């Protein structure tokens, strides 16, 4: 992977085909049009600790675990969605997924207006893709299941603190040492190490974006 640093500082980032969204350590929200090589971030009103976007909407949660969404191009305004989540994923095909402060798992069919259904299991972080949803638990064990919530959780070998399933053909993740791994979908645990260090990452198409331990921003390609 050829990494390019993007100007700016973010603690969490999400990528879509046309936009990057992120939040900084002060929970301020920023938007940049892809590919964002120049780092021309626009601050968006509001305060969020985590964001995730699909082609149409960006979703996020604030320090009180309140849930918000708005159009991915930054138009309109934040709309509150009922429920409480510490982490939300909008990238899953047909479903919003999230986990709450007790690591309980929820899904909601798009366009979600708060009709959450609890899904069995416990995960601390989750990310949806085209056919599967991927997540990690408090022990950094890795799981996947069909993105519509059918079937059951299947453990994938390996250990990650954060995973992204939104890439086209690969799953990406980072471990407790901020080492970066990739695995060809649907991924049964054949992880290969990527150069670099990231604490959080997200993927769109064949592009991966992420932030490191000092909130520097990077993208592949």
From Swiss-Prot:
SMART domains associated with the record: TECPR (SM00706)
Superkingdom classification of source: Eukaryota
Residue ranges of Sequence repeats: 1-38, 39-75, 76-113, 114-150, 151-188, 189-221
Pfam families per the UniProt record, alphabetical: Tectonin
Gene Ontology terms for molecular function: carbohydrate binding; metal ion binding
UniProt entry keywords in alphabetical sequence: Antibiotic, Antimicrobial, Calcium, Cytoplasmic vesicle, Disulfide bond, Lectin, Metal-binding, Repeat, Zinc
GO cellular component term of the entry, any: transport vesicle
Predominant localisation class: cytoplasm
Gene Ontology biological process: defense response to bacterium
Subcellular location: Cytoplasmic vesicle, Secretory vesicle
Annotated region (6 X approximate tandem repeats), positions in chain: 1-221
Disulfide bond sites: 32-36, 108-112, 183-187
Expressed in which tissues: Hemocytes.
Protein family per UniProt: Belongs to the tectonin family.
Function: Lipopolysaccharide-binding protein with Gram-negative antibacterial activity. Binds zinc and calcium.
Name under which the protein is recorded: Lectin L6
């Amino acid at each position: 992977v050829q990494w390019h640093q993007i100007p700016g500082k973010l603690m969490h980032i999400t990528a879509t085909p046309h936009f990057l969204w992120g939040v900084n350590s002060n929970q301020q929200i920023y938007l940049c049009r892809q590919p964002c090589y120049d780092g021309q971030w626009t601050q968006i009103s509001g305060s969020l600790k985590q964001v995730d976007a699909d082609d149409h909407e960006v979703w996020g949660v604030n320090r009180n675990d309140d849930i918000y969404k708005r159009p991915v191009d930054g138009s309109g305004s934040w709309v509150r969605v009922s429920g409480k989540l510490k982490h939300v994923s909008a990238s899953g095909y047909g479903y919003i997924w999230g986990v709450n402060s007790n690591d309980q798992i929820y899904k909601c069919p798009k366009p979600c207006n708060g009709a959450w259904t609890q899904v069995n299991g416990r995960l601390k972080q989750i990310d949806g893709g085209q056919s599967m949803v991927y997540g990690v638990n408090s022990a950094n064990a890795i799981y996947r299941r069909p993105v519509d919530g059918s079937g059951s959780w299947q453990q994938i070998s390996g250990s990650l603190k954060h995973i992204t399933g939104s890439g086209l053909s690969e799953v990406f993740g980072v471990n407790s040492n901020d080492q970066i791994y990739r695995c060809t979908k649907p991924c049964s645990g054949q992880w290969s190490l990527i150069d670099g260090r990231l604490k959080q990452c997200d993927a769109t198409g064949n592009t991966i974006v992420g932030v490191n331990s000092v909130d520097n921003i990077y993208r592949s390609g």
